[in-house]
Amino acid sequence: MSKDEHKLPLSKRKESIIFMMILFAFQVFMVVLFSVWVRYSKNEVNYSTLTPEQLQELEATGGVVQEEVTNIYGYFRDINIMIFFGFGFLMTFLRRYGYSALGYTFIISALVAQWSVLIYGFFETVDHKNDHGGDYASTFEMSQTVLLQGLFCAGAVMISYGAVLGRVTPLQMLVVGIFEPIFYFLNMFIGEMNLEAIDVGGGMYIHLFGSVFGLTIAWFLTDKKSKDCEDNSPSYTGDYFAMAGTLFLWMMWPSFNAAIAPLGEPQFRAIANTFLSLTASTIATFIVTRLFGHLGHKIDMVHVQNSSLAGGVVQGCLAHMNINPGGAIGMGFLAGVISVIGYLFISPFLQRRFNIQDTCGIHNLHFMPGFIGSIAACIAAWKGLNDRSLYNPIEFNQIFRAGEDQARNNAAATFISIGIAIAGGLFVGMILKALKKVGGLKAKQYYQDSAFWHVPIDYPKDVEYVVEQNNLPMPTTDNGDNVVGGGVEMKKHNNNNNKKENGYRRDLIRLLETLVRNEQSTDSSYSDSDSSDEEEKERRIRKLAKKSYRRSKKSHSEHQPQHQPEESTFNNNNNNNNNNATAETTDNGGSSTNSPTSKV
């Protein structure tokens, strides 16, 4: 291959240059502003006036700064693990998109963590002036809590990324990482700093906002080619890694909800309520996924990876409130049930009716549980205002900062969060759609690392490569554990057109039946089928084979077959006996170079 053939297309080179220039300019901008405006948090004491005893005590305790480090750093570490490891690995389920899921999570979260310090500092400075008057502060003190706010914002951006996973370029994700934090902290400025709404774990500001923002930009990036892409499917190994992300998120979620809760009883309640809610949502997930499971009450790994976390999301707003342990379990169970139902019914409806393709199902994991938790916080606030015996005087003032208006303010903040997320998503979505002209993904590059990453030799092969090697359509597995072969472009040639279409159709369907049987013989999901279902299985196999042929023929009708498969590929003994031909091909599928295997 010549040197020129290794070069990126012109549009991709433009995208790469623009990406690097923006990222470099951003970093220079950060260096300048952090140097000029940001200062470390420090103990507000006049050391010259302290007595030796006071200096010794300050040296031993570390003062206010050390107290904050002691109280917060453990949570800061756990949330770091959640953002960079948990969210990253949770999105590695796609068969050919692991590098991008982890890599984009890494770079964009790091960028957002820096950028958030400045944006939060700006709104904090404005709020301080509104409360205390005077001039704007010339510097901003960066504390451990400010760094924590940057991680929270990165979590919202990663939630939005889940909706468009596999359909964005690095440049598009960079735009999301720069603009979404602005809308995120604007929403916090209104809801947290002015309305003083209750939201200890980001149920509104992170989950609800991030999911609505992501679904809005997904509307701009959804097209027929991305919806029909064969690579928008999980792999067995990818699901392993995604489940690792789920487990880390599950274990660390109590820290996420308790990090900024008031010390003492409220912080303990935040940990306990979140943990109990997570256990309940996990139990609910296994119940509902088996109840509605494919092919005889089978467990769906997609549901386990995502819906088991819904209990942590639903507690986001009110985890530190006195809602009773039974209430926490009930909320978690309800969130788990609704999340699984969302994956089964609501996501397909959104894609079909509203043209919103939600790759990771953030609507089901973040939007619905987040909205339920936001409404529950309004109810809990109303109950707490009417029964003050639930809280001691200190924690009551810490939780109910808006006083008698707390329930109304929480309701207002909920819908303001949705409104700002939609407005911000529309603005950013239009930019992302315009950027599709600058190195945007082609139809064959959706859900593939190879578009922007160097990939190793064992990178999962492209469907067209498999077809080229076998001269036959390659079946894939859809969400229903069914084997299909639609959307495959077969390699053609111009020399062998003398056979009629009907004969080719018959042989191709016969081969597809064989491939389905091979897949079933090696797939444990079929190993426990009852013998009484053989007739139904045979009917389904033939139906799938015919459907695969029709889809392949319809999608690529302009092409002609490169060569006709040899008769021996389809029938090792007798061309007139379809059943014997299928059996022979199944038995000898691994011994002939011309017969495709069920594993490529």
From Swiss-Prot:
Topological domains annotated Extracellular: 38-73, 124-145, 192-199, 262-274, 324-325, 383-411
Single GO biological process annotation from the record: ammonium transmembrane transport
Coiled coil: none
Feature: compositional bias, Basic residues: 540-554
A GO cellular component annotation in the UniProt record: plasma membrane
Superkingdom in the source lineage: Eukaryota
Record's subcellular location: Membrane
Cytoplasmic side: 1-16, 95-102, 167-170, 221-240, 296-303, 347-361, 433-600
Similarity comment: Belongs to the ammonium transporter (TC 2.A.49) family. Rh subfamily.
Descriptive protein name: Rhesus-like glycoprotein B
